[in-house]
């Protein structure tokens, strides 16, 4: 899980979602998991 000030989709399988008021990227590639914060 990378924590970044701005999250972006890295590949076409990445999805930007909101969870508990946080913007996150989920992907089938675990290296692409990101959270804003």
Swiss-Prot record:
The keyword Ribosomal protein applies. The keyword Ribonucleoprotein applies. It comes from the Bacteria. One of its GO terms (biological process) is translation. GO terms for molecular function: structural constituent of ribosome. Keywords: Ribonucleoprotein, Ribosomal protein. GO terms for cellular component: cytoplasm; ribonucleoprotein complex; ribosome. Belongs to the bacterial ribosomal protein bL36 family. PANTHER family: 50S RIBOSOMAL PROTEIN L36, CHLOROPLASTIC, LARGE RIBOSOMAL SUBUNIT PROTEIN BL36C. This is Large ribosomal subunit protein bL36A. It comes from Arthrobacter sp. (strain FB24). The lineage of its organism: Bacteria, Bacillati, Actinomycetota, Actinomycetes, Micrococcales. The gene is rpmJ1.
